[in-house]
Amino acid sequence: MTLVLLLSIFAICFSSVAFIQLLPTRREKKSSEAHDAVSVQIDTIVCLLRPPRSSSNSPTLNRVADSTPNQELLDHPLISIVALPSPPALLQTKKKFLFPVAAILKVLQQAWHLWAALGYRTGPAHWILVQNPPAAPTLALALLACHLRHSRLIIDWHNFGYSILALKLGSGHPMVKLMEWYEKAFSCYATAHFCVSNAMARILREQFEIKKPLMVLHDRPSSAFSPIFDEKQRLAILSSIPETSQSAIDIIEGRCRLLVSSTSWTPDEDFSLLLDALCRYSTSAKSSGLPSVPLLVIITGKGPLKDMYLSQIDKLKAEGKLFNVFIKTAWLSFEDYAQLLACATLGVCLHTSSSGVDLPMKVVDMFGAGLPVVGWDQYEAWPELVTEGVTGLGFDSADRLSGLLKSVLGGDGSALKVLREGAVKESRNRWDQTWDPIAGTFLGLVT
């Protein structure tokens, strides 16, 4: 009996020691007089190949990423990247009835690897900056890591996870309701919050009841996006991109207009609206009997609905409904995409906003390249990004978009010139101007 008791005590002690040893290491709190370097981890389960807001954050931040980032991040001496494996292909289902099961398994897989990265593969940091969405499993795991490692949590709100999920399942689905509760419940425990628009800040205060510091950080383009004015350089760029090489000279000399639209081919971007507008534009050009400038439309990006829309494009071509309109799709490197925007005539944004308060980064990139934009404007935050008639124009229907294409791309070019000048002026607003006085100061990175 005594032996059993001693063995039990030994087993409990051994298990306790092992458990404590397995806990993530904690950040040692320095005295008020000590000035240790501020460290920040960015927790983001997104592709960093096309750097969104997270890759524009201060170069003193460490990253947890799940994809290959651009070379600028890889080469930076103050950035260390901890990669997460992508979910298995079998969890990428398009079938709605399988989605709940696949989603749960995907979250569990991400949770396992993310916890290993947050708790063991990285050192303890002063701050953990979580990009939201995705909310699951990042919010819960980041809060746990902060508790165990003496770190503090900042949530960087790009949108709401539940509003994006509602696009797939419907707003009344139990999983959407659960996600909404989860985001609201866990977000209240963060130390501070960043968000992309004033409209989003209002929602966070009124509906999420956020009481902690909440700072609006409007997106700004990275240094890769900048206007290119030299015609020889523009010609060289267009000639080097397969999708524009045959039309490069015509584009430079104004005999062809180059439209660029970046899309994720998802339900929150109604690409059929652009196709309808282009058909209307084509019909108008054909019926007028007057010479019309050809349009070369380059669509970049990958996504689940791409094949469906490509079939629609082929059908429209076969029916002769795209007279003088040539549509090509492309998957470009980050650098080529940035240069393509700088050489384009007009950008098109079909982002409709699942929440009404997020802002499309693609428009920010277009402005960074000095490219004016026409975009869907039927959501609250649109005026925070685009100054109507100065940097771009909004539309609410295919008919309106078709009219904008005719007025901006036709005539004597004065309308396009005004928008181009506005976009070039907007391109001077850069990330440091937003980050340094707000986030940089709050984090102690800028004094």
Swiss-Prot record:
Species of provenance: Arthroderma benhamiae (strain ATCC MYA-4681 / CBS 112371) (Trichophyton mentagrophytes)
Purpose: Participates in the formation of the lipid-linked precursor oligosaccharide for N-glycosylation. Involved in assembling the dolichol-pyrophosphate-GlcNAc(2)-Man(5) intermediate on the cytoplasmic surface of the ER.
Top-level division of the source organism's lineage: Eukaryota
Bilayer topology term: Single-pass type II membrane protein
Presence of keyword Cell membrane: no
Protein name per Swiss-Prot or TrEMBL: Chitobiosyldiphosphodolichol beta-mannosyltransferase
InterPro entries the record matches: ALG1-like, Glyco_trans_4-like_N
GO BP annotation list: protein glycosylation
